[in-house]
From Swiss-Prot:
Protein name according to UniProt: Sodium channel protein type 7 subunit alpha
Naturally occurring in which organism (per UniProt): Mus musculus
UniProt intramembrane stretches: 340-367, 674-700, 1128-1154, 1421-1444
Taxon lineage: Eukaryota, Metazoa, Chordata, Craniata, Vertebrata
Matching SUPFAM superfamilies: Voltage-gated potassium channels
GO terms, biological process: cellular homeostasis; osmosensory signaling pathway; response to bacterium; sodium ion homeostasis
Amino acid sequence: MLTSPEPKGLVPFTTESLELIENHIAKKCNEDPEEEEGLKPSRNLEAGKRLPIPYGTLPRGTVSEPLEDVDPYYYVKRNTFMVLNRSRVIFRFNAVSIFCTLSPLNSLRRAAIKALVHPLFRLLILISVLTDSILMCMSNLPEWILAIENTLLGIYAFEILVKVIARGIWAGSFSFLGDLWNWLDFSVTLFELITRFSPLSSFLMLKTIRTFRILKIIPLNHGLQSIVMTLAQCLKKLFGAIALALFFLAVFSLLGMGLFMGNLKHKCLRWPEENENETLHNRTGSLNYSPERINFYYMEGAKYALLCGNRTDAGQCPEGYVCVKEGTNPDNGFTSFDNFGWSLLAMFRLMTQDYPELLYHQILYASGKVYMIFFVMISFWFAFYLTSLFLGILTMTYEKEKQRACEESGGLDPKCQQTVKELDEENDAAEMETTQIEMKKRSPTSINTTLDILEDTTLGHREEPETSRKKCPICWHKFIKTCFIWKCSPCWVKLNEFADRVITHPLADLFLVICIVLNICFLALEHFPMSEELRSLLHVGNLVFIGIYTIEMILKIIAMHPYGYFQISWNIFDSILVVLELTEILLADVEGLAVLITVPLIFIKLGKYGPPFKSLMRILGSSLMALKDLVLLLCIFVYFSAVFGMKLFGRSYKDCVCHIKEDCQPQRWHMSDFLHAYMTVFRILCGEWIETLWECMEVAGQAWCIPFYMMVILIGNLLILYLFVTLVSSFSYYDATSEVNKEAKNLQLAMARIKSGINSMLLKLMCTERSVPTEATDQICDPSVKENISGHTLSELSNTQTFLRYKDQSSSTEKTPVTESESQSLIASPSASETVPIASGESDIENLDNKETRSKSGNGGSKEKMKQSSSSECSTVDIAISEEEEMVYEHEKSKLHKNGYERKSSTGQISRESRNGKIWKNIRKTCCKIVENSWFECFIGLVTLLCTGTLALEDIYIDQRKTTKILLEYADMIFAYIFILEMLLKWVAYGFKAFFSNNWYKLDFMVVIVFCLSLIGKTREDLNPLTSIKFLRALRVLSQFERMKVVLRALIKTTLPTVSVFLVCLMIWLLFSVIGVQLFAGKFYECIDPTKGERFPVFEVMNKSQCEKLLFNESMPWENAKLNFDNVGNGFLSLLQVATFNGWISIMNSAIDSVGVNMQPSFEYNLYMYSYFIIFVIFGLFLPLCMLIGVIIRNFNKQKIKQGGSNIFITVKQKKQYRALKKLLYADVQKPTPRPRNKFQGFLFDLVTHRVFNVIIILLICFQATTIMIQKDEQSPQMETAIFWMNSIFVMLFTLECILKLTAFRCHYFTSAWNVHDFMVVIFSITGLLLPLTIGQYFVPPSLVQLILLSRVIHILRPGKGPKVFHDLMLPLILALPALLNISLLIFLVMFIYAIFGMYNFAYVKKEAGINDVSNFETFGSSMLCLFQVTTFSGWDGMLDAIFNSQWSDCDPDKINPGTQVKGDCGSPSVGISYFVSYILISWLIIVNMYIVLIMEFLSIPSQKKSRTLSEDDFRRFFRVWNRFDPDRTQYIDSSKLSDFAAALDPPLFMAKPNKGQLVAMDLPMAAGDRIHCLDILLAFTKRVMGKDERVEKILSEIESGFMLANPFKITYEPITTTLKRKQEAVSATIIQRAYKSYRLRQNDKNVSDTPAIDDRRDDLTSKGAHSGKIEEKASIQTQI
């Protein structure tokens, strides 16, 4: 972007100014418009922004008066003038008086402009809009409110009138109708007038339009306008992604129609009895009698009939019922695939992952479990790929916007930056001078204290954003010195010094931290029910902590004086905490008044001593301040949506409530009032919208509900995703080691002193037991040594030589804390005593993060080689490894050194020269060769897979398959023997030390132990539980496959540094859990009617005592909710369900119904408890999620940089394939098919390769997809016949295409995979159509023929055939596939392990809630289905709810399970909680990295310059266009035709107009007559497309030599100039002419004036004319540059 020239003065807009603008408009008609094409508006001078500082203060007479525009873009091109208000805000108006626009000098317009730009006018409109917005959210308003609404309407009409007069109706971009916001304002006002004063007021839609008035807040705030414009740019960038999403949505919807049309109507209908006359025709037919609801089979507590299917893996009906297609679809008929509309809604539901488990179960019941593959594919494409795509585009847009803002702030208005810098320097100098004067006036005794105060104050200011401080009056300074800086008697000074020593001592901070932690622990101990002893203990502890905090505050005030104390923000925070806690003691009778405030403050107080917490909070605060406009826009949108929904659907929810509930009682989720409408919108934005949409369609119809919900979902998610991207980007710069505050340093110092004291005591004890040399002891006792040995172990302390060596190192360097790697380098390695040769194990680089491989020297620069304890002829000898090699996990094996294993034998060991030594050596060499043989490794890998796979066979039916059970028992023993043998071989080959120093071998050893324990468990019945650990055998897969090793290493390296951030997030959750316990402990109990299973109404049972007095109370109906806040642990689990939006609705319902402890809940009694969950979702879920993901991305980028920019989740071999694939995809080189020499075949070749032919085929595919869209279930026979003939026509057309291509391409046809696919589609389609006609049976259903034809729709994604934007969006996925596949393998292994564990522990759990016939843990397939749901964070609350059944009232522990010896159907709550929580955390971590891989791959595409290789066809098309511009074959073209020639070329050589600036910048040689040679143009255009490097230079030389061969008679010429020089000459001539004209104008003005006094305004006009000339001159130069 071009910068504006030096700022000129503010010139009033006069008649002469208007004449100049009119003359300029007349001149522009005769000049070349491209001379001003490069002139762009300055972003610092945009309308709505403040005038920059370099323009100085506003002179008198310039405020609210028309001024000449200071931006050359608007002055030269847009013909505008500007107006400034008192706040220096820029307003721009059109100066041309056309289309009912008054002159800028008209008094009426000037008065309107003054009113429009006045801040009070803007404030009046803002207050009116806010008042109107508040009134709109209220219901049942009194009559006098109508007068206020009429007044507000009058204000809006007056505003429109003022704007029309000031701006004109339609005269340029700054007219009234030139602003879209004015269109909205005018429309809303017009409709409001119609509804207020016309008979049309009864129309609901006209009344609803008034709610758009809320959006009027946006144009009143420039920041909101900027955010809206940014989001509009994001939508432009997202256009391709939205189109791709709609394409996939349509394709999968059609696929769903073909697979599941009509299936959801299959229900279990009662079989007619023998005495009934009705008969059943067939299993899929209909009964002769009309089925009623009573005839269907319903599960206990189910609302809809049980679905079934006729496949063996589908749902089965109980005895006495048959599966028939009758009735309506489930969910009130809104869930189906019977037509394209409902199928599209179902696919959109899966795309947003809203309640997908219900749809899974419905489809699997009706169609079969095999269709779970369809949902896995849908989840990958929609929930993963498209989400990553949207996030990637938003991230790229945000990064570009941030980069542009940085460039503007760094490059624009340097004078402004210099002015600000000078002002800052003056302020600093004045403050320093004032400080020196104050110091001179003070007494010497107070200087030290004041310095401490200043030091603390400075420290506090460093932790806060710097703000400008205003100078205070002298009297105020005297008052401060007298009242807030205490100078009393010497006793007070001593007390001051004592308090200062106490509060600054490191142990004081450690003591405070311990007290805060204990205070938090005391808060976390509260639970329900709680004994009186514990309650009193917690109360006393709370009083003690309050006393400690109060003493701390008093000591700090004494030590620092009140003035210094309150200069630090943390001290102010501490004082507030103390005041609130003292208030809590005084108001102890008011329950929960101050607790909810003090509890968060205590947690925040702990964060004072944690640098990660402070850093994260600082980043969060700065980010939210920078994003305040975006947050405000999101709040406005939510408010608008709630009000709009309330106005649109409120009456329908009241009048048609009986359509939802049979008892006609109000629902929890509706839009009858603002609060419920707001919560409904909030629930929609949280991703749960389908259930409320069903209810909305029941009461208000589909026509309004679906558009409203789509608006809220799409716009709301766009705002949330953009906010998410910006916050994640901010946290990606987090560095925990960047700063350590004073309190943290004190804690480190205190811990170091404690460790030093403990070590000194240990040294004394050891010195009494051993005789330590005096010199060594003296050196150890040196303070520098004591300070740095605190982190060493007892074995290190016993090594005196280590201390001596460390003493020498520490004396030559600064006293810095010893890092872990440095401390390990100080440990003396044991001497090698093995005399026999051994083989080294795998490279230590594979030991995850084994830090024994190398150590850093004291200077930290060089790496030392570790001394090998042993070696072998067949061993892999580790060499010195660089950091880069370690990061990519590449290592080399050095060649065998003949004497590498020769070591001196120590006493008592086997000698190498002895006979036994040689035998042992040969045995070890043989074992080494065996274990390192590739065939042996493949055999072990195969055995590992077989061993892991057999675990899937041990389901609940294993006892019924006796043979399989026996085979598995023998297989377990065989596998155990093989792995034991392998371990023994490695022990012999590598030795124990090398074996157990490798973490992967440790894992193998653990698996062997698991094998042994499981085999032992089978021998005795009392040891049978040991067999349940067999699932750990699958962990051996990790050590056998390099891909999983790479992924696991990368996960560890990207996750471990986030531990501090994870702890911060955990503390936030602990805070919310403690608050939840304070709010809801013991309040979720309710009295249940055992006959109905529902809660008693509150007017029948009010509390626990009344419930227990009921006569039929035999089963204790006073029950607690399974998810509650009775203690911190339950609170964590409840918050996890809220965070995953699973089961959170029931938790919120219990919370808002809660009345009190031992009180019966009442419907929506505590409605405002919704705020607790809203705050948690924002501050406990959204923001911590941004923190974690941002830090993970930072670590991901760090590891990626260390590996040279390559992907960290792929192996070395895959990296080579990745580079090759990347070059292939970016090069976009396609091997052309040779054109046949036969004329007929050549004609067909030209036909099928023509673009029009490809377009026709794409249109045919789209038409064929349209024929599927118009179909529906139970359509008429005429429709069936029409569709059959349309399918036949499409098959014939596609067959004709296949024949034409076969004839044209010949054998080359089958070299393309796309052609092979088309050929197979044609064959299957013909077969599907002809078989029914020949044999009369449909072996291939007609719907399947349509789906086969539909598969051709993927041609739209074909590179070069479909839209290019689709190809660009698919590139990241293709490039990221290797990494995604590796990560998928790891997550599949995790799912496999957890599925086996679930089969062992939850196979016999009672089928209830989320566990049913389809989703259970009985078999491996069902377990994987359950875990797939949990992986997408859906449905795990229902499974956990079923596992919670562990009491006699909920399950039967003695139930006999047929076919097995296991009894009972109870679950284990503790095991279930651990199972699901651990799996959610692990799977979330892996999935987040999958998202990051794909997003980073997408972001890397624009950062790399796409160097495209031009093909022969590109050059052929170039010369084809050249022939049109050079028909005489002169090899030259006139320079005036160059622009048209560049615009006529085909991509990638194509250059769109305006392109003169780009062509001039190419600096093309020109011959006589302003002609340019063909070769020069070709070479320049090729270089523009392919870039500049050595490879391109070679290609250019080849092009030039090829051109010379093809044109041997090239005309030689000498270029006389270039395009750039010629343009510079023309611009220079124009500048000279304009300068001369300006000079002549000034001379004429001097001659005309007869008096020496010249009108000031005329001088301004003259300077304006000269400056305007300069602006135009600079604009012309900048245009060409």
